[in-house]
A protein has these predicted regions:
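Nucleotidyltransferase catalytic core that binds NTPs
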Residues: 2-202, 210-220, 225-227
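Substrate/ligand-engaging "lid" and interaction regions
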Residues: 207
């Protein structure tokens, strides 16, 4: 989708040649049902990348990415993996680290581009590169959104029409949080967000305001740090 294509555009501005990879990684899915239902549109994806001008598309098979069997490596992400998504998806980020490290070792890029939509994943990949000392620079690319603010995602096609309309609450809430950040405390912001979701059809797994580097949740805004809000 256009969110993925924005990664290509960012890469093309700074590199002579751009390779896009497509691989559905089974070790980062905690729920086998989610893996089975994940949208698979390979031919359409390749067509879009070709139209955009990508120089090459790498579509490895399972054996190429997991020559020693379907196992994840264990990483020390210095606690990044224990926050937010990590609390609900144990082992997920080891799966991410394993597949991205293998991809980098095979392709050997100078630069790699990942969307900020999965900000925790972006932080994890930066930490993996730091730990493994791979010679690649990781770049984050701002989230691309639909006109109503919903982040572009392959999984959006699985939403019903009603769910799709209701999903805009996420971006609307984050936009409010950005304004509240200027005048309210962390605790006051949290209470307001919880109230918004209490009156919605969504069950809120987490709302976190965290240090953008460590992803550690904060209960106070320190002037020398930058923060991000996550739903």
């Amino acid at each position: 989708h256009r969110g993925h294509l924005s990664l290509y555009k960012a890469a093309k501005k700074e590199n002579d040649e751009v390779i896009s990879s497509i691989f559905l990684n089974p070790t980062q899915f905690n729920n086998p049902d989610d893996f089975q239902k994940y949208p698979k549109t390979l031919e359409k994806d390749i067509e879009l990348l070709e139209k955009a001008g990508v120089d090459a598309v790498y579509v490895p098979n399972l054996e190429e990415m997991y020559p020693d069997g379907l196992n994840s490596k264990k990483y020390d992400f210095e606690g990044l993996e224990n926050e937010m998504e990590g609390k609900y998806r144990p082992g997920h980020f080891d799966g991410v680290g394993t597949i991205v490290e293998e991809l980098f070792r095979q392709v050997q890029p100078h630069n790699a581009y990942f969307g900020e939509k999965d900000y925790q994943q972006l932080a994890i990949i930066k930490k993996m590169v730091e730990k493994t000392k791979l010679p690649v620079k990781i770049h984050g690319v701002p989230t691309l959104r639909e006109e109503d603010g919903l982040a572009m995602s392959s999984r959006n096609v699985r939403l019903t029409e009603t769910q799709r309309k209701e999903a805009t609450i996420i971006y609307e809430t984050l936009t409010k949080v950005k304004e509240w950040f200027k005048v309210l405390s962390v605790e006051e912001i949290k209470l307001r967000v919880l109230e918004i979701f209490r009156n919605s059809n969504f069950e809120l797994e987490y709302f976190v305001i965290a240090d953008e580097k460590t992803l550690k949740e904060t209960d106070y805004f320190y002037k020398d740090k930058n923060y991000r809000a996550f739903i």
